[in-house]
Amino acid sequence: MLAQRIINGENISKEEALSLFVDNNIDTYDLLHEAYQVRKYYYGRKVKLNMILNAKSGICPEDCGYCGQSKLMKNKDKYLLVDSEQIKSGADFCATHDIGTYCIVMSGRGPSDKEVEHIADTVEAIKHEHPQLKICACLGLTNDEQAKKLKLAGVDRYNHNINTSENYHDEVVTTHTYQDRVDTIEIMKANNISPCSGVICGMGETDEDIIDMALALRAIDADSIPVNFLHPVKGTKFGNEDNLTPERCLRILSMFRLINPSKEIRIAGGREVNLRTLQPLAMQAANSIFVGDYLITDGQPNELDYKMLEDLGFEIDINESEINKAALKI
């Protein structure tokens, strides 16, 4: 049994993973069942909730082909870094709605030192009011000194997605390298900030690219892996892409779980438009979701997510230490 091999500690190879992913003779729901056995072993029926705040929007020199905030987009919502009270208001909402992780996101290549100070001061205030709330910062490319300030302020996690495979990266963006992204993740790890890194599927990548992404994140050892499904933005390079089906999304999530068995696999942007009515099934592979809106696209109403989890018989987990430690042999 595939799931039992993985639970026993075996890392599946690229060759086997790719074969599982592309073989039409392997039923999607059989593959999803294997993923669920692994998910259940590490997380039971628990689900982590995350919420995003778009704290700075549309001001960016990068040319990412999926992004409505890139330098190539003319009609976009632009604003500078919001004040502390607005950021803290989002934290208050999280604390009263069983949302365990609050993600503060900024557009741009990377933050200025002044912006890092602003975020750090605000995070300190949030931690004073809500010490159990996990704070994830997503500010772009950073340096070691900035990472130290964020750690000291109480930032628990830092998100910087690899977005795609190293082989496909230059088709997605040309203003920074794949290694730039990996370097930022490594800086955070060196400063004992939990690394969060994920992908965007549906940008024209190959099946092999999908598997390469999951394997790269295994090598990076990201604690949290958001899996985004492209929600095409009109006017972007990938604005006309339409190659995802709900079933393909389920296969992708299954492979990310099987390749990264103990990690937090989060269904992120684009789940509503790509998974559609199969969103509940996706929770058999994933153990985490974003609630509320995304950066520039709308999510579904919160009450639908809470109701979905209730109907599934899943339990909201706001304590990130609740992973099955026996399973991890800690």
Swiss-Prot record:
Free-text comment on the cofactor: Binds 1 [4Fe-4S] cluster. The cluster is coordinated with 3 cysteines and an exchangeable S-adenosyl-L-methionine. Binds 1 [2Fe-2S] cluster. The cluster is coordinated with 3 cysteines and 1 arginine.
One annotated GO molecular function: 4 iron, 4 sulfur cluster binding
Family matches, as InterPro entries: Aldolase_TIM, BATS_dom, Biotin_synth/BioAB, Biotin_synthase, Elp3/MiaA/NifB-like_rSAM, rSAM
Keywords: 2Fe-2S, 4Fe-4S, Biotin biosynthesis, Iron, Iron-sulfur, Metal-binding, S-adenosyl-L-methionine, Transferase
Pathways involved: Cofactor biosynthesis; biotin biosynthesis; biotin from 7,8-diaminononanoate: step 2/2
PROSITE patterns, sorted: RADICAL_SAM
Residues that, per the record, bind [2Fe-2S] cluster: 103, 136, 196, 266
Domain called Radical SAM core: residue spans: 42-268
GO biological process terms on file: biotin biosynthetic process
UniProt EC number: 2.8.1.6
UniProt binding sites for [4Fe-4S] cluster: 60, 64, 67
Signal sequence coordinates: none
Catalysed reaction, written as an equation: (4R,5S)-dethiobiotin + (sulfur carrier)-SH + 2 reduced [2Fe-2S]-[ferredoxin] + 2 S-adenosyl-L-methionine = (sulfur carrier)-H + biotin + 2 5'-deoxyadenosine + 2 L-methionine + 2 oxidized [2Fe-2S]-[ferredoxin]
Cofactor(s) in the UniProt record: [4Fe-4S] cluster; [2Fe-2S] cluster
UniProt-listed NCBIfam families: bioB
Family in the record: Belongs to the radical SAM superfamily. Biotin synthase family.
Assembly and binders: Homodimer.
The protein's role, per its UniProt record: Catalyzes the conversion of dethiobiotin (DTB) to biotin by the insertion of a sulfur atom into dethiobiotin via a radical-based mechanism.
Name of the featured protein: Biotin synthase
Organism, scientific name: Macrococcus caseolyticus (strain JCSC5402) (Macrococcoides caseolyticum)
